């Protein structure tokens, strides 16, 4: 999730300030958002790329477990992680091969949701309307 990505980044930034991400947020860890990490990664920041790679492994593991159990035809990445686009989709797709039985990957479609960071709250509101 975007919040776990931010928490991991905050912990790592306490130990390593020599990167573009730290400069982009002017050292203010409390202001860090997932979007900052994705933007820095797009600018070539290896620190941010490593964070995305780390998070994509956990997402692939979770998605792989779902695929192995219920085998859906489509997975939608939404919320704050959807802001990453291909930066998160490509590593997830690659890592799914490690965590998923091959038949579950045959007809799988992975998409990025269009609701962005507000997907969860909009879904919750829709349930009550």
Annotate each PLM feature.
Residues 1-129:
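ATP-binding/phosphotransfer module of carbohydrate and carboxylate kinases, centering on a glycine-rich
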